[in-house]
Amino acid sequence: MTTIVSVRRNGKVVIAGDGQVSLGNTVMKGNARKVRRLYNNKVLAGFAGGTADAFTLFERFERKLEMHQGHLLKSAVELAKDWRTDRALRKLEAILAVADETGSLIITGNGDVVQPENDLIAIGSGGNFAQAAATALLENTDLGAREIAEKSLNIAGDICVFTNHNHTIEELETK
């Protein structure tokens, strides 16, 4: 799988992810790009789960963003509705972390849209490790969002065999 982490702090929001693609217990690729900018670079999105499934969801989510003029929550809810009702989409195995200047959301394969507590998202096989690390850093340091995301991904990469140290990091200014 992978690890994706999103941190919002001090006027910045970051989504970061590692680059490992695994097939069973074999590393197939180490430099995949699982974090992207969408909708005229105004929305960040990262995925954990099946790569082909995630690209399908990225495309559909970007279409929803265009339909709803970049409104993050409305686009996420509409994608989740499709995910629940479309027979082909229901079989997709992926989870998305998305953020814009105003908010962050998790969109699950069950069609759920969740606004995280404390503006922290950590998903994927190393998500629990990254979340624990990021929580500790948020509560006990003055580090910025980017540094917290990097450090928590490094810790997840040290522990989780499905997470590596080849990171993609995207950042936006927040309101």
Curated annotation (Swiss-Prot):
GO MF entry, a single one: metal ion binding
Alphabetical list of CDD domains matching this protein: protease_HslV
Domain of life where this protein originates: Bacteria
Active-site residue list: T2
Modulation of this protein's activity: Allosterically activated by HslU binding.
GO BP terms in the entry: proteolysis involved in protein catabolic process
Main location: cytoplasm
Known function: Protease subunit of a proteasome-like degradation complex believed to be a general protein degrading machinery.
Subunit note: A double ring-shaped homohexamer of HslV is capped on each side by a ring-shaped HslU homohexamer. The assembly of the HslU/HslV complex is dependent on binding of ATP.
Identification of the protein by name: ATP-dependent protease subunit HslV
Organism: Photobacterium profundum (strain SS9)
Gene assigned in the entry: hslV
